[in-house]
Curated annotation (Swiss-Prot):
This is Probable helicase loader. GO terms for biological process: DNA replication initiation; viral DNA genome replication. Forms a (host) DnaB(6):helicase loader(5) complex in the presence of ssDNA. Belongs to the phage P protein family. The gene is 14. May load (host) replicative DNA helicase DnaB onto single-stranded (ss)DNA at the origin of replication. Keywords: DNA replication, Early protein, Host-virus interaction, Viral DNA replication.
Length: 229
C-alpha cells in the first residue's frame, strides 16, 4: 500500500496538472488519511474473524492492497472515521447469514443506518442540528426545542459552539458530530446517564388590571344605573 508521503505527492501532482489545463483544484472535506487508515486497520482484523473464508481468497499482496485501497477510499469519501461508526456496521455484519464479505458501499451503508449505544448515527445528529438551527426563532431557548432525545440537545448545543468558534465547514461539522457522538456513547457504555434537558419553569403571568375600554364601560354602566344616561 502507498505510504502517506507518496499519496500526498500524487495529490500534489494531480493538482498541478489540473491547474496547467486551466481546471479548478479539487479539495475534499474528509478526515485525514492517517485517521481513516487507523480505523480501517482495526476493522480489518474484525473482518478476518467474521468472514474467514472470504478473506482467504486474497491470493497475492496486490489483491490485498487493492482491497485496502477500495475500502479506505469508501471510508474517506463517506465520512466513516470513528470506531463507533465501524462498530455499528460490524454489529449488522455479524448478523448476516451469508458468509460473504460485504462490498465497501454496503458496509458504509450499515455504518450509517445503525446507531451505536444511543441508537443514533451522525446523519441523524446533523439533520436534527439543522432543524433546530432553522427553527430556533420559534423558541425562547434551546431547551424548549422538541429534541428527539436528551443527548441530541447536548451534542447539538456543543456543535453550535464549536461551529461558531472555529467557522466549521459542513464536512468538519459532521466529523465533530461523530466525535461528540462517540464520546457520549462511551459515557453510556460506562454506565453514566445522559443528563435531561432542563427546561426553565415559566414565571406566573402577572395580574392585569382593567383595560381603558373596560374602565369606560364600567363608568357608562354606573351613569346609566344612576339615570344619568
Amino acid at each position: 500500500m502507498k505510504s502517506l508521503a507518496e499519496q500526498m505527492r500524487n495529490h500534489d501532482r494531480e493538482q498541478m496538472s489540473r491547474m496547467a489545463h486551466n481546471l479548478p483544484e479539487q479539495y475534499q472535506e474528509c478526515a485525514p488519511v492517517e485517521q481513516v487508515a487507523q480505523v480501517f486497520n482495526k476493522l480489518f482484523n474484525e473482518l478476518r474473524a467474521a468472514f474467514p473464508a472470504s478473506m482467504a481468497n486474497f491470493r497475492t499482496q496486490e489483491d490485498l492492497n487493492e482491497f485496502r485501497r477500495q475500502w479506505l477510499l469508501a471510508f474517506q469519501e463517506n465520512g466513516i472515521h470513528t470506531m463507533a461508526q465501524v462498530d455499528a456496521g460490524m454489529r449488522i455484519a455479524r448478523r448476516q447469514e451469508r458468509p460473504f464479505l460485504p462490498s465497501p458501499g454496503q458496509f458504509v451503508a450499515w455504518c450509517k443506518q445503525s446507531g451505536g449505544a444511543l441508537g443514533v448515527n451522525v446523519d441523524q445528529v446533523i439533520a436534527e442540528y439543522w432543524e433546530w438551527r432553522n427553527r430556533s426563532f420559534e423558541f425562547i431557548s434551546s431547551e424548549q426545542f422538541p429534541w428527539s432525545q436528551p443527548v441530541m440537545y447536548h451534542i447539538c448545543v456543543e456543535l453550535r459552539h464549536r461551529s461558531t468558534e472555529r467557522q466549521l465547514t459542513h464536512g468538519e461539522l459532521a466529523r465533530e458530530a461523530g466525535d461528540l457522538l462517540d464520546m457520549w456513547e462511551r459515557r453510556v457504555t460506562e454506565g453514566k446517564p445522559v443528563p435531561p434537558v432542563r427546561r426553565a419553569i415559566a414565571a406566573p403571568a402577572a395580574e392585569q388590571g382593567p383595560t381603558p375600554i373596560q374602565l369606560l364601560l364600567a363608568k357608562y354602566n354606573r351613569n346609566k344605573s344612576n339615570g344619568m344616561v
